[in-house]
Amino acid sequence: MNNIRKGDEVIVLTGRDKKRRGTVLARVDADHVLVEGVNVVKKHVKANPMANNPGGIVEKTLPIHISNVALFNPATGKGDRVGVKEVDGRKVRVFRSNGAVVGAKA
C-alpha cells in the first residue's frame, strides 16, 4: 500500500520549497511525485513555427523525490508519517501521531 497517493495534500520537508504545501498531481514512478506549485522551474523553449509553437520562457513542474515530502495532517498542522490499519476488514492509511484515518472528513 502506497503511503502517498495522487490527490493527497503533502508538505515539503527539504530543499528550496521547504514548508510549502501542495496537492500530489501524479506519481511519476515509485520514488518521485509531482506536487502542485512545488519545484517549478523556468524552461527556455525555442520557437518552432512548423508546430505552431511561439517559444519563450515556460514554467514547468518537475518531480520531487518522495522522501522529501510528508503527508500533511490537518489536525496537527504538520507533516506526518503514515501507517496501515485494518478497519472493518479493509486496510486504511492512518496518521502515526494521532491515529486518524487519512482522508476522513472531520
UniProtKB/Swiss-Prot annotation:
Subunit structure: Part of the 50S ribosomal subunit.
HAMAP family per the UniProt record, alphabetical: Ribosomal_uL24_B (MF_01326_B)
Job of this protein: One of two assembly initiator proteins, it binds directly to the 5'-end of the 23S rRNA, where it nucleates assembly of the 50S subunit. One of the proteins that surrounds the polypeptide exit tunnel on the outside of the subunit.
Keywords noted in UniProt: Ribonucleoprotein, Ribosomal protein, RNA-binding, rRNA-binding
One Pfam family from the record: ribosomal_L24
Biological processes, Gene Ontology terms: translation
Recorded family membership: Belongs to the universal ribosomal protein uL24 family.
GO cellular component, one term: ribosome
Transmembrane residue ranges: none
Domain of life (superkingdom): Bacteria
Organism of origin: Bordetella petrii (strain ATCC BAA-461 / DSM 12804 / CCUG 43448)
Single annotated GO MF: structural constituent of ribosome
Gene3D superfamilies, A to Z: 2.30.30.30
Protein name per Swiss-Prot or TrEMBL: Large ribosomal subunit protein uL24
